[in-house]
């Protein structure tokens, strides 16, 4: 497991990356799994940052931490919370799983997820 300090909704957020053996029928020998430990932007409103005594540049720190890991070649996104995923429902994917796990492989999901969250935080900065 490779931990990466990624300040997100709190200054101490950590993201984790680890490899798993690829399932039969994939081109790779190993797949990279990634979990971002704190994508929730709810603590980055002006009032919440003041309440939590976060530094005024916490939104910038959040965006910089996303930039550090956005290009990781993640094959399988593991959301830290059900609502912090990408544009699909992980419970629905799990229900459709044929036992192979292939339904969870999405090489573009990591970048889509982080880009969407970063854009939300950038919009907060422009309010």
What residue ranges belong to the model's regions?
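Metallo-beta-lactamase
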Residues: 1-98, 102-108
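C-terminal regulatory/interaction regions
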Residues: 99-127
């Amino acid at each position: 497991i490779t931990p990466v300090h990624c300040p997100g909704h709190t200054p101490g957020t950590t993201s984790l990356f680890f490899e798993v053996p690829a399932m039969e029928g994939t081109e790779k020998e190993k797949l990279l799994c990634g979990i971002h430990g704190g994508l929730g932007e709810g603590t980055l409103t002006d009032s919440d940052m003041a309440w939590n005594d976060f530094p005024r540049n916490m939104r910038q720190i959040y965006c910089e931490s996303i930039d550090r890991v956005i290009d990781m070649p993640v094959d399988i996104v593991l959301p830290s919370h059900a609502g912090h995923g990408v544009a699909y429902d992980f419970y629905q994917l799990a229900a459709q799983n044929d036992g192979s796990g292939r339904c969870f492989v999405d090489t573009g999901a990591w970048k889509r997820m982080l880009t969407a969250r970063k854009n939300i935080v950038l919009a907060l900065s422009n309010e």
